[in-house]
């Protein structure tokens, strides 16, 4: 078969303008292969700019690339290997090995652009996926087959919480796909080593597009990880865990690509197609009658702004929202989850039962009231509160401290052994605190314990 070859006529950053024969223009989203002194890379057609010219985004390096260089139209979108061959491997955006092992033998390859499941194929039956992390299981439970977002600014513990969730949920069995989008290289290597030492790597695929790579790589690596998860769901009919760190970097890469194309941005400098790009991506993360994809996604908040357009565009697609707050981290309480800003549609009696629901509502009420009283305490002190309010403040502080927890993934740094808390122990502990059984105890005794059984 004759190769369809084009010629690069201009290079502007990562945007390539390429000339083809008029009758052989590649389609939008098709992959183009080009070579530099560093290796062979792909570009993606994003626009037809003339009768015989296209604009493409380089999904790789462009150093050393020059006008006049040849480009081969592959005739299809980027395709990545899927199935058993990629289990236990660390891959890049093209599905090529970056773990120092031989390339995965690609018996099957799937394009990274796929249609979302049809409405009649979706499975609406959901159940709770208990994580062993107290504040999540109590206040914002995760749905199996649902989408959960971890929102927070820089340095509040999103990645550590994500790694603990990977550790706790992966231990229950099943297949996992971790997609690192625009994050630090050391985090990817650290996660890979953690998975290897815990014995869950053989059932996990790690796909990385680091922050030092081109915006095209960071924009498309999320689709590579999602495609691998979709194959496990649709063809192997398995329940899959999809971890994405970080959705903001995916959006940011799209913004960079949009700017490179000269498109007019919206508020905050984001691309005008922000909602559609996020929607297309999120709608593919779905549970069907074949199997489920349970996704847990980190979302960075620029300047800790929960109203940032990137966060707002993501909110509507999620079943559970877990918000981490700097003021809680400053108190030394980890995970630094704000129970009042976090929510889950699974927190209703249908999913969790009446007892769990009522306890969660009481916890939210007592913490909200404590926040209101905190302003009085800051100005006038505890002495000005009524006896009833003083009792409420002490119980609220015990609850706040009790929701802290030592993690398995941070054992080597803290020297404290991680704890997985069963849901019954969690509910019994909260019940006892709310009922006043521990009113005589110090608030500090409730920091970083598992349940009431750990109180001496």
From Swiss-Prot:
Any Pfam family hit: ATP-synt_ab_N
Catalyzed chemical reaction(s): ATP + H2O + 4 H(+)(in) = ADP + phosphate + 5 H(+)(out)
Intracellular or extracellular location(s): Cell membrane
Highest rank taxon of the organism: Bacteria
Positions that bind ATP: 152-159
Enzyme Commission designation: 7.1.2.2
Database matches in InterPro entries: AAA+_ATPase, ATP-synt_VA_C, ATP_synth_F1_bsu, ATPase_a/bsu_AS, ATPase_alpha/beta_chains, ATPase_F1/V1/A1_a/bsu_N, ATPase_F1/V1/A1_a/bsu_N_sf, ATPase_F1/V1/A1_a/bsu_nucl-bd
HAMAP family: ATP_synth_beta_bact (MF_01347)
Role noted for this protein: Produces ATP from ADP in the presence of a proton gradient across the membrane. The catalytic sites are hosted primarily by the beta subunits.
Assembly: F-type ATPases have 2 components, CF(1) - the catalytic core - and CF(0) - the membrane proton channel. CF(1) has five subunits: alpha(3), beta(3), gamma(1), delta(1), epsilon(1). CF(0) has three main subunits: a(1), b(2) and c(9-12). The alpha and beta chains form an alternating ring which encloses part of the gamma chain. CF(1) is attached to CF(0) by a central stalk formed by the gamma and epsilon chains, while a peripheral stalk is formed by the delta and b chains.
Membership in a protein family: Belongs to the ATPase alpha/beta chains family.
Protein name stated in the entry: ATP synthase subunit beta 1
Organism: Listeria innocua serovar 6a (strain ATCC BAA-680 / CLIP 11262)
Gene (UniProt): atpD1
């Amino acid at each position: 078969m004759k190769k369809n070859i084009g010629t690069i006529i201009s290079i502007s950053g990562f945007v390539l303008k390429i000339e083809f024969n008029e009758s052989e223009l590649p389609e939008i989203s098709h992959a183009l292969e080009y070579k530099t002194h560093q290796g062979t890379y792909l570009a993606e057609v994003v626009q037809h700019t003339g009768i015989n010219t296209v604009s493409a985004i380089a999904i790789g390096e462009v150093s050393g690339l020059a006008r006049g260089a040849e480009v081969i139209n592959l005739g299809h979108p980027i395709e990545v290997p899927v199935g058993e061959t990629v289990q236990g491997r660390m891959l890049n955006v093209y599905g090529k090995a970056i773990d120092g092992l031989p390339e995965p033998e690609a018996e099957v390859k799937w394009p990274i652009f796929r249609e979302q499941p049809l409405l009649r194929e979706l499975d609406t039956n959901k159940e709770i996926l208990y994580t062993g992390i107290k504040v999540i299981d109590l206040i914002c439970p995760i749905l199996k087959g649902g989408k959960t977002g971890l929102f927070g600014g820089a340095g509040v513990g999103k990645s550590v919480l994500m790694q603990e969730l990977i550790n706790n949920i992966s231990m229950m069995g099943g297949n996992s796909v971790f997609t690192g989008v625009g994050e630090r290289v050391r985090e990817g290597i650290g996660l890979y080593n953690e998975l290897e030492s815990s014995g869950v790597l053989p059932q996990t695929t790690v796909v990385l597009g680091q922050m030092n790579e081109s915006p095209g790589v960071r924009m498309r690596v999320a689709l590579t990880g999602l495609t691998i998860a979709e194959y496990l769901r649709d063809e192997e009919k398995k329940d899959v865990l999809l971890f994405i760190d970080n959705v903001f970097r995916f959006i940011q890469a799209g913004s960079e690509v949009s700017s490179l194309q000269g498109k007019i941005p919206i508020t905050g400098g984001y691309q005008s197609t922000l909602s559609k790009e996020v929607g297309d991506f999120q709608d593919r993360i779905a549970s069907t009658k074949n199997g489920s994809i349970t996704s847990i996604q980190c979302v960075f908040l620029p300047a800790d702004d929960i109203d940032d357009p990137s966060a707002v565009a993501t909110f509507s697609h999620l079943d559970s929202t877990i918000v981490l707050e700097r003021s809680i981290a400053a108190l030394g309480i980890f995970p630094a989850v704000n129970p009042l800003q976090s929510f889950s549609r699974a927190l209703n009696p249908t999913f969790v039962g009446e007892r769990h629901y009522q306890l969660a509502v009481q916890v939210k009420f007592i913490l909200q009231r404590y926040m209101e009283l905190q302003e009085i305490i800051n100005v006038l002190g505890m002495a000005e509160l009524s006896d009833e309010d003083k009792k409420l403040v002490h119980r609220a502080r015990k609850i706040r401290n009790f929701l802290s927890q030592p993690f398995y993934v941070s054992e080597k740094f803290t020297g404290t052994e991680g704890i997985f808390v069963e849901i019954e122990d969690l509910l019994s502990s909260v019940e006892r605190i709310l009922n006043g059984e521990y009113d005589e105890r110090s608030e500090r005794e409730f920091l970083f314990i598992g349940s009431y059984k750990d109180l001496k």
